[in-house]
């Protein structure tokens, strides 16, 4: 089986939703999205990208660095979309990491 995988730094899922829908229309098996900028409470929006795909995501965050650099907007956010009829199972595993900003030795 050939597997088509795509990764895309979408710099806002909402701003690039049509391009992302184009990826699913191209029969990509798995689509990884970075910088979705979707907050945790908006991850349900992933289900509306394409009815033939399942999805899982991690919400964007607000941090002091993001607030200063991004004029108060969140940063980050990840998502994975995969075909519902795929011959594999996807399990979501969350590893909580809390980055520290500033000087590093």
Question: Model-found features: residue ranges?
Answer:
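Short phosphate/oxyanion-binding micro-motifs
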Residues: 1-105
């Amino acid at each position: 089986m050939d597997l088509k995988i795509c990764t895309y730094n979408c710099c806002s899922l909402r701003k690039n939703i049509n391009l992302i829908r184009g990826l699913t229309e191209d029969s990509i098996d798995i689509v990884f999205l970075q910088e979705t900028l979707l907050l945790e409470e908006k991850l349900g929006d992933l289900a509306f990208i394409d009815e033939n795909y399942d999805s899982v995501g991690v919400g964007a965050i607000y941090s002091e660095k993001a607030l200063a650099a991004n004029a108060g907007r969140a940063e980050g956010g990840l998502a994975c979309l995969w075909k519902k009829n795929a011959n594999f199972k996807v399990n979501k595993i969350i590893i909580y990491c809390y980055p520290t900003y500033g000087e590093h030795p």
